[in-house]
Design a protein with these regions (language model features):
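A short helix-loop-beta-strand connector motif used in the catalytic cores of GNAT acetyltransferases and
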Residues: 41-52
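A conserved beta-turn-beta hairpin within the catalytic core of GNAT-like acetyltransferases
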Residues: 67-75, 84, 103-105, 130
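Conserved acetyl-CoA-binding loop-helix of GNAT-fold acetyltransferases
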Residues: 79, 85-98, 120, 124
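Conserved beta-strand in the GNAT
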Residues: 52, 58-66, 73, 78
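Conserved GNAT-fold acetyl-CoA-binding loop/helix
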Residues: 16-40
Length: 154
């Protein structure tokens, strides 16, 4: 598998892959592919970098990340559907760790709790649970609605 830094010319393809990622992980994001392309252009023109992984001339995965002073935040890692469970994700992470990212920074990634395969994958490559984000959706706290409370132990 080869890899290269993504450029702005890659944004249309990255947007298509990002759209697949959103659908596959069950995210609520409703952005269209053109909107995702514009967002990707903005990210790559700013503080994000992307790496594209190819095999036999085919794009098989990509990673999108932002390097900060003390950490590297991996926003997205996506392997195309027909190439999953073939070691590509693990190889992509290994390339990031061994050839792209400095070894002196904390590495973070966020995963949707409902995406069990992704949670298992990240744990299998060395990431450990750190935080859990909880939310209340607008419909859940509309006027006149009382939030459900879980009884606490005495």
């Amino acid at each position: 598998m080869t890899f290269r830094a993504a450029t702005l010319d890659d944004c249309p393809r990255l947007a298509e892959l990002n759209h697949q990622l959103i659908r596959d992980e069950g995210h609520r994001n409703r952005m269209t592919v053109p909107e995702l392309e514009q967002r990707m252009r903005s990210w790559l023109s700013g503080e994000y970098r992307a790496v594209i992984y190819e095999e036999g001339g085919e794009v098989v995965a990509y990673a999108l990340f932002r390097e900060q002073q003390e950490e590297i935040y991996l926003r997205q890692l996506f392997v195309v559907r027909h190439r999953r469970s073939q070691g590509i994700g693990r190889s992509a992470v290994d390339i990031l760790w061994s050839q792209i990212w400095p070894k002196t920074k904390r590495l973070t990634v966020e995963v949707l709790v409902a995406n069990g395969r992704a949670v298992s994958f990240w744990r299998s490559v060395g990431y450990a649970d750190y935080a859990l984000s909880l939310e209340v959706l607008p419909v859940d706290h509309a006027p006149g609605t009382v939030l459900k409370r879980t009884p606490t132990a005495p």
